Amino acid sequence: MKTPNNIKYFVCPVCKMDLNIINSSKVRCNNCDYDYRVDDGIPILLPHKLVEFKRLEAEYHDIESDSYAEINMISSHRVVYHHEKYLKHLRELPVGSVVLEVGGGDGTDASKLLDSELIVIQSDISVGMVKKAKTKVSLSQINSSSIHVVCDAEQIPCKNGSIDAVMIVAALHHLPSPEVFFKEVNRVLKSGGLLVVGFEPNTWPYFVIYPFLKRLGELLSVRKRFKYTEASIADQGALGFNEKDLKLFLQAGNLEIVELQRVWFLNGFIHMFLSSINSKFYSKDEKIDLPVFAQKIVIIFDNFISHIPFLRRFCWHWTLIAKKL
């Protein structure tokens, strides 16, 4: 077992008091009289009793941790392009700034920040995902520039005003209460600290595209041939967010908007089709995609649409940049 010498960054997720190292597999909150498990140097700082919804989310992503990149085509240029747009805000932070990624999945985004001389805390509610993220980091970076923890996004185990930036990508819609998360972000951020909310789904596909595809799949019995047939409990119940929702979340967290990016128009249809085909019928080494030059042309088209009144409402995703007042 590895000693959890990164514990200085964390507090008890319940009472927010300091933690003490008991041994290589356990840390204790004396205030709560509660021991938290440490797995391979990763503190498991979850609430004492995880609600059923969150437990099922964690179990699902434990199982899917090895398939995450394959399912979401995260190396595609259309994905990387928009990820780089919000990562730019974090790379501009001063050297030594502490960035917390919540719901970080397999660590793809967090690993891209490690060459920017930032301290990156990679977290997820899934132990399997955090372990997967840890494999993307060199031994010299572990517990120095790259810290790993298992935690609940609605009970962040960090001290008040201790974080320079918080990032959550394609995970806000997995939370039972986004408002609670935004309040937690306000608590842990330093004054003027940044929040990056990346790739959150818009509402309209849930009422137009997905019901149509579901019905079509039932008629054609397509799902019987699919490689992946299940979704997480959060994805099954998700309805996305509209612009008004995001503004209400900011208000709940007393945060100020810096930038709202509209992600994908035509690219949303393309990505949905290709990711479905690849995740159902192709292996990791056989996935198909548009040539990069074609993807760049579609991005130019999408950027043009994003400036047209009315049509700009129909982006597939949002990226929100905000700061603490």
Model-assigned labels for residue ranges:
Residues P4-I7, L248, E259-L325:
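A C-terminal cap/extension of S-adenosyl-L-methionine-dependent methyltransferases
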Residues L100, G104-Q155:
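Class I SAM-dependent methyltransferase SAM/SAH-binding core
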